Structures are given as structure tokens and as C-alpha cells.
Amino acid sequence: MAKIGSFIDNKYEILKKIGQGGMSVVYLAMDKRLNKQWAVKELQKYTKNANNEVVIQSAIAEANMIKKLDHPALPRIVDIIEEDKVIYVVMDYIEGETLEYVVNNQGAQSQDLVIDWAKQLTEVLHYLHTRTPAIIYRDMKPSNVMLKPDGNIKVIDFGIAREYKESNLNDTTYLGTRGYAAPEQFGGKGQTDARTDIYCLGMTLYHLITGKNPMEPPYEIYPIRYWNPSLSGGLENIIEKCV
């Protein structure tokens, strides 16, 4: 584990720990050359647990995937530093809160806000789907969308994203978040493609506009105007077409 005040690659000073998962620690760091703060994810390269090894390799693959992307709604990865026992991934430090935090604390969001977020999310999905090969995100949900202080969003956590391969017909065994994930993401009976992300987007918008978490009872999706008759019929149709 990196020490507070230490330097990584003689460039990034570790300021404080800002997050920790099972296989990684995230620090806030200062780039002394650019006078800019970055988030630095520390990954252990080796583990005695085979399952943990898979998680680590997935995180490394995620970093290499994001590093190739360039979109204002995606975090940038600016450096990947490999040392004897650890790998450091240097990326944008994103200020703000997740949309999950926002809806949990404020309830259903206004129609204007949700439409604005929907436009931003569809733009980033279009960007991903038009890469060569296309990138299928597979985990759109409020907790994976950061709302910045300026009102713009960032899509985070590419842990289960993949490059689309038409011949890969069985790629979907239990990947995704129940309530948001498309049916083909469970059971290994179908292939995920751009339509998978559209389904997840629809469920995300449903949660934001109704305040009803699809992961909680009644586990049934009603038209959004069932919950709020003043909402737009057009928005209701869009969400229903997504899912």
C-alpha cells in the first residue's frame, strides 16, 4: 500500500486514500509537474486466490480499454505504471456524487434533468458503440454515473465492458446488475450487443424519473405516468422502447 506523502514514478505525490475495494486502493494524488490532481488506483499484481487473480486481470484490461477512449463523459486514463508487485492506474479525479446518491437522497428527479442526463448518456453510448470494434458497456445504472458540480455526467466503472465480437455467442453468464441488466446478461443464452446497453439505459432512466429502484419490490416495471401522471408521454414511450 502506498504511503501518504510518497511519490509514484517520481511524478505523483500521494495525498490521501479516497476509496478501497477488495482488490484495489484508490488515492488522491498531485502531479507536481502539472499542478493537477489525479485519482490513482493501486492494484496488487499477484494473489494466492485464483478468483482474485481474475478480478485483477479484469481491472488491468479495463484500464487498457479506457486508455484508448476519448470522450468528455468518460474518465481519462493518463498513465499506467507497473512495478514489481503493484500496478498504478492514473486517471481523472472526478468531483461530485453518483446519480444513485442523488436519487436516494432527493427522490425522483425532475423531467428536465432526466432528459438532459439521458441525452448525455445516449451520446456516450453512441460513442462506445461506434468504436471499431464496438464497446458494449453492460453495466449502466445510477451508481455508475457521476454527476459533476457543473451538471455534466461521467460514466465510470468499465469492469464488465467488452469489445463486441459477432462470433462470440456465449459471453453473458451472470454479468450485470439485476434490476438494470438485460435478460440476455443472465444464463448465458444470448450475446450482449448495443441493445443490451439501451435496455440498461431505460432502466436507469426509469429509476431516476420515478425514484423507484428496480432492484427492490415490487420488481415490476409500470409506465412512468402510473407513478406521476404529469410526466411526458413521449418520455414514457422512449423508456418503454428501451426496455
Name every feature range the model reports, one short phrase each.
Residues 117-118:
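Activation segment signature within eukaryotic-like protein kinase domains
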Residues 80:
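Activation-segment/catalytic-loop signature of the eukaryotic protein kinase fold
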